[in-house]
Amino acid sequence: MTSSLVGSEMCIRDSFMDPEPEFTRWAKETGADRIELYTEGYAAAYGTALEDDILQPYVDSALLCDELALGVNAGHDLSLDNLEKLLTACGNIQEVSIGHALTVEALQFGFAETIRRYNELLDRVAAKPRVFPQE
């Protein structure tokens, strides 16, 4: 887990972490405004039989953030393929980091088309009810 906890009116304090409840609670105790969920595990499991089991801790972390009044960001290996399910399941994600996938998708589809596809995906997610799958 890494943390950037520099407080000021112009700086959001966040902690980059795995979806572990104790890390989320620690972030709140140290004064973070948000957490950023490290999504490599979810991205690696996407499209496999483990997908839903791996997704559940992210959902649980998002729910805990609601309880603790923490914002939620997410990032690492997110793409057009896997982003919609994550955003739908964790309805309170405020920001995502799309890095390498955006470059690869832009080479594949063109930059304008890739951005259009992300905007379309975000519109679909915004039109859905907030869903937090529970066991």
Predicted features by range, described:
Residues F16, I54, G75-H76, L107:
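Glycine- and other small-residue-rich loops at beta-strand/loop junctions that grip anionic moieties
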Residues D14-C65:
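Histidine/lysine/aspartate-rich catalytic loop segments that bind and position anionic ligands
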Residues G47, E51, E105-K128:
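C-terminal helical cap(s) of enzyme catalytic domains, especially alpha/beta-barrels
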Residues F23, I54-S61, N82-L86, T114-Y118:
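A general structural detector for well-ordered alpha-helical segments in enzyme core domains, enriched
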Residues I12-F16, D33-E36, G71-N73, I93-S97:
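Structural preference for beta-strand elements that scaffold enzyme active sites
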Residues M1-G7, C11-I12:
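Single conserved hydrophobic/aromatic residue that forms the stacking wall/gate
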Residues I35-Y46, N92-F111:
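Glycine-rich phosphate-binding active-site loops on the catalytic face of alpha/beta enzymes
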Residues E20-T30, L78-I93:
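Catalytic cores of alpha/beta
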